[in-house]
């Protein structure tokens, strides 16, 4: 079962708040990417169904980027919302996990939140990593190209790179 990437964003933001850690849009997108990668490697299924794009500063989930772009480089102080088609209001995107998933995501997220956004960008840009191979496939720059789950599965999970 895949989850709404905006709900995962809210999970990360809530986790950061509990630890009094500020997080920018750049850092948030990278953390979600590494959570998705770790989940995919560990459980053999994607965490989210959202398309991951290879932007200049690493993997980006367009839905997350646009939801929080108003914060620029500043700390995000809001949560992701989606339109409720029945009420016409925007409601917070919630998240709920089974015990095993919650334990896994908490452990991964707590580790990732301690890494500065710039270092997360560097980790996402590893040569022969999924971002690098998507971005520079066929020997040319391909901005915004999709980073597929198949590409992610061919790279080492983040923890194995340290």
Language model regions located:
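Domain-edge interaction signal
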Residues: 1-162
């Amino acid at each position: 079962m895949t989850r709404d990437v905006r709900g995962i964003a809210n999970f990360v933001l809530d986790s950061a708040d509990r630890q009094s850690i500020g997080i920018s849009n750049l850092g948030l997108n990278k953390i979600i990417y590494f959570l998705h990668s770790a989940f995919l490697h560990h459980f053999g299924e994607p965490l989210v169904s959202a398309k991951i794009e290879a932007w200049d500063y690493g993997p980006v989930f367009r839905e997350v980027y646009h939801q929080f772009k108003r914060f620029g480089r500043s700390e995000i102080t809001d949560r992701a919302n989606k339109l409720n088609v029945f009420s016409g209001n925007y409601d917070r995107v919630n998240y709920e996990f089974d015990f095993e998933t919650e334990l896994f995501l908490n452990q991964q997220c707590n580790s990732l939140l301690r890494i500065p956004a710039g270092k997360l960008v560097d980790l996402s840009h590893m040569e022969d990593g999924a971002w690098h191979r998507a971005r520079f496939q066929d020997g040319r720059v391909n901005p915004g190209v999709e980073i597929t789950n198949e590409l992610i599965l061919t790279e080492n999970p983040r923890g194995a790179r340290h």
